[in-house]
Amino acid sequence: MYKRQGFGYKISAVPFHFWTPDVYEGSPTAITAYLSVAPKAAGFALILRFFNQIFSEMPNGLSDPWISVNNLPWPQLIAILSAATMTLGNLVAIQQSSVKRMLAYSSIAHAGYMMMALPLMSTSSIEGIMMYLTMYLFMNLGAFFVVIYIKDVIGGESFDDFNGLGWKMPHIGMSMTLFMVALTGLPPTAGFVGKFYIFAAVIEAGSNFYCCLLYTSPSPRDCKT
């Protein structure tokens, strides 16, 4: 049980996410950029390795190896936590006035999307998580690089400091827009490709429970409108 709590803390999953917004906002932006991708990538790699090792030691022919993990309905529990993580991250992100806090809650929401494929533990779900992590790394680091540049030039990190960015610095404004659209998951960006692989793995599993979770999940609104 403690291992699962540690995993949740590592990837900023609800209800172990409370440290994320304050750490993101209080740390230097360069450090925040590192924290936004490195722990999450390491956390998901560790989770996949952990459960894969457990399942490889299960007796052959076991219909549902998850049942042997503390006799708890882990697929359903992880799916519920995934839905809670997606919902809270997306809804709270659009209420922030600080770009760094917005990206913090965006990071929480993205963890929820990747958690959606964890209970499946199929080849396609693992590939989907790895693909999503790779796309997320480039999208998130790009957004933070823009924040670092604006901080150096203007001296602020709030949304007010980004007002009129398209007129003042067209190239920077276009770059930030592209990264935000990608984080939202709109086609034809890399964010859409990452979410496509995750959703495809869920649909391929054919479980009514996970398909219901997929269709009722909130829209990925990771940028403030």
Q: Regions from the language model: what does each represent?
A:
Residues 42-53, 115-123, 180-188:
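Hydrophobic alpha-helical transmembrane segments in multi-pass integral membrane proteins
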Residues 3-6, 70-83, 133-137:
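Structural signature of hydrophobic alpha-helical transmembrane segments
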Residues 13-22, 87-100:
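C-terminal ends of transmembrane helices
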Residues 3-4, 33, 92-158:
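Alpha-helical multi-pass transmembrane bundles of energy-transducing inner-membrane proteins
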Residues 7-77, 104:
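Short helix-boundary/re-entrant hairpin motifs in multi-pass inner-membrane proteins
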Residues 3-4, 15, 19-37, 104-106, ...:
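Interfacial and helix-entry/exit segments of alpha-helical transmembrane bundles
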Residues 52-60, 116-129, 203-209:
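Helix-coil boundary and interhelical linker segments in multi-pass alpha-helical membrane proteins
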Residues 1-5, 215-220:
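Conserved small/polar residues in nucleotide/adenosyl-binding loops
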